[in-house]
Amino acid sequence: MQQEIELLGDERFESQNRETASERPAHSQSDEDLLDGYSRTVITAAEKVSPSVVYIEVEQPIRSRRPDAARTPPERRGSGSGFIFTPDGFILTNSHVVHGARKIEVTLSDGHKCQTDLIGDDPDTDLAVIRINAPNLVPAQLGDAQRIRVGQLVIAIGNPYGFQYSVTAGVVSALGRSLRAQSGRLMDAVIQTDAALNPGNSGGPLVNSRGEVIGVNTAMILPAQGICFATSIDTAKFVASRLIRDGKVSRSYIGLAGQNVPLPRRIVRYYDLAVASGIFVVSFEANSPARKSGLREGDIIIGFDDHPTAGIDDLHKLLTEERIGRQSSLAVIRGTDKLTIDVTPEESENRDHK
């Protein structure tokens, strides 16, 4: 915004001094030309991806704890955005837009409405895939997250507050951010942007100047201005492939509840530990891998398969699909002793435990 103010100030100064075009260096562009070029870039990118953007309306049952509640629960309506990414009707959106929905309806850019099948959703990355059956669909072109640079132009397209196909522009403010998903897990490799997002933008595409999707718009920080986030398209590609193949994203779990705690300094020094904190084991899920391993309440986990774990988020990142059924080792502080305990992670079923 400061740069924009300075540009406007320069225009006024030049106008007051009545500088003519002939007095300018031949190789320089006027501010008007630069702004026209910026506008053309945004317009071209938006026009390229707009046919792929969809408006999503959902109906979700409202659960009531009252015993006298009606047998047919009342419904809550919500909306969001998404985008077609395959010619045969697969659509990416946010998990929080469609999770638990009884009915999902998609409106295409031409106004055509389609009933929708939920293929799968992954609350841990706030991503979901739905599918429609319609002819002549235009899939968005997916970009490469490895080519994103801080400061580059990005355009967000969505349906804020039900106003369909709204376009905002900004820049990539930062890369590699972490954001807490509604499931409690930490999402990594998140893109921060100042392109304005509002309720209803969720699930829409964040595109570069070539109209390639580089992120899935997911969240904004309120009441802050200009702090919005998008899930990296590389993460979205991986999650979408798993949802289409399996209807879910498999992760491993060991079945414990814990909290992050600092380690006594003398323990850190004595064992020359790579971390100064760990995971204090509070409880276990019944018959869980952690319970069967011999781990005890009060133990402090400081490592998993030779990877330091300074906290629960570190352990979450390591409990991947590849570790399901494979024996792993936990580095543990018990009292003043350092132990190694073998554990075999099992497949997670969206449990609250780790």
Task: Place the predicted regions along the sequence by residue.
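A structural signal for beta-strand boundary/capping segments at domain termini and interdomain linkers
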Residues: 113, 327, 338-340
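C-terminal tail/sorting-segment detector
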Residues: 342-344
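Short, structured beta-strand/loop micro-motifs enriched in basic residues and often containing a Trp
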Residues: 134-139, 279-285, 309-313
